[in-house]
UniProtKB/Swiss-Prot annotation:
Annotated source species: Arabidopsis thaliana
Subcellular location: Plastid, Chloroplast; Plastid, Amyloplast
Protein name per its UniProtKB record: 4-alpha-glucanotransferase DPE1, chloroplastic/amyloplastic
Transit peptide segment: 1-45
GO biological process, one term: maltose catabolic process
Amino acid sequence: MSILLRPSSSPSLCSSLKLFRLSSPDSLIDAAVLRNRTKPSQSFRMEVVSSNSTCLSSISVGEDFPSEYEQWLPVPDPESRRRAGVLLHPTSFRGPHGIGDLGEEAFRFIDWLHSTGCSVWQVLPLVPPDEGGSPYAGQDANCGNTLLISLDELVKDGLLIKDELPQPIDADSVNYQTANKLKSPLITKAAKRLIDGNGELKSKLLDFRNDPSISCWLEDAAYFAAIDNTLNAYSWFEWPEPLKNRHLSALEAIYESQKEFIDLFIAKQFLFQRQWQKVREYARRQGVDIMGDMPIYVGYHSADVWANKKHFLLNKKGFPLLVSGVPPDLFSETGQLWGSPLYDWKAMESDQYSWWVNRIRRAQDLYDECRIDHFRGFAGFWAVPSEAKVAMVGRWKVGPGKSLFDAISKGVGKIKIIAEDLGVITKDVVELRKSIGAPGMAVLQFAFGGGADNPHLPHNHEVNQVVYSGTHDNDTIRGWWDTLDQEEKSKAMKYLSIAGEDDISWSVIQAAFSSTAQTAIIPMQDILGLGSSARMNTPATEVGNWGWRIPSSTSFDNLETESDRLRDLLSLYGRL
């Protein structure tokens, strides 16, 4: 292997360079020698090149290196930079209207994140959640959650008057029904004023609606919502046959009768997009990348399934043959029955996975990078008969593998994804992840069970990996610690080299930052040292989830101690 020294402004490599190549003592060395230089250059970088380069010339072993030799230093690959970030969903921000939003608190958080030295903000899926608030069981894979729209930002855009805003409410946790009742009428009013207007904002709305990368999912979503609002059925499976199967005449009739609803739906999505892109652009200016999150599956009662039935495993009547889930695991003795329809991967392959290509393109529009939940489902997926009551009766089936990601790369170019590879991880999952270069995950709460070969222990981490103190599905560090028995605590304290447990949250945070993993992500709850009451989600439960908000006594302006502590640790472990 040869080492090429390349000046940043050299007009001709061959005219100014020779190449050094160390070989056996009896052989010659191909050397890169800068001619006619009297001062060392600071602008060299070292690269590996093939030994048969046409620029090579030879000198004998033992001859002097040029005076610039000590300047031939390797330049770090920017893609290998160590970094850290915080997991905090926008619903968890403080705010006056019952739910966090994309207003001032989002910008304050980015400023605070920048002050800590963190360079990643991870969010949960931004899609409309289900009635319980879960963003992993929403009705659309591409739409934004309009409850995240800031009413104050609508005032700034001239779409609402300040006097129209409701009286502030002090809600310690998110109540989605209350937030919807409080905010939705005003968001609708703002959307109507936008449609009726004629200014620059109206022009941007039309551009948004006509963008092919947007319209390919937005029109279906708008029609689906209009029909659903009109019929109020349990699912699209119960709709009249012409609507259920998307007869053109039936859709035209819906447009005529529901034009205002459809136009308002699209305008609301534009308002979400506008506010989110403002937040994202501000984060970019502050050196913060936004990491999104994408559930692998979509809900049955969704525009995605209704408009793309051929891409899902449905019977002739449109009902799921098989549904999603996972076998028994750490979270459930009978497995988790998610109930989403499964993809017909063979049908998807026949049109080059166009549905997935469009979905990833949408993710690129929203995020700088994206975690894909349940990545293992691309290698092999757990299929449960739709009539089953528990997931444990399912079977493993072969997934699309690398062919899906080849099609995505061909369709949208280079993508940055993080593979959520927790649970039952077989060899084919590891091979698939490595074949596409995606980092996997390690979770420190899983590290202290088993022996020294536990893959979640820091000494077993990989460089191309994202380490978490815990995810949205875990308890907080403090809450998790309180559930451990004394033997487990003693083992963890010995590994973490701590004598006491008073500061256990920060001890685990430090362990995450010290990991060899390139990226470390810490939930905001752990930075605040909160207990189980701040847990975001408990898998296999249906109530009491997705409601956590930053305590009213906490402001990003008074988190200087936490900011300084984070920055010190990031500096210590090379993550600034």
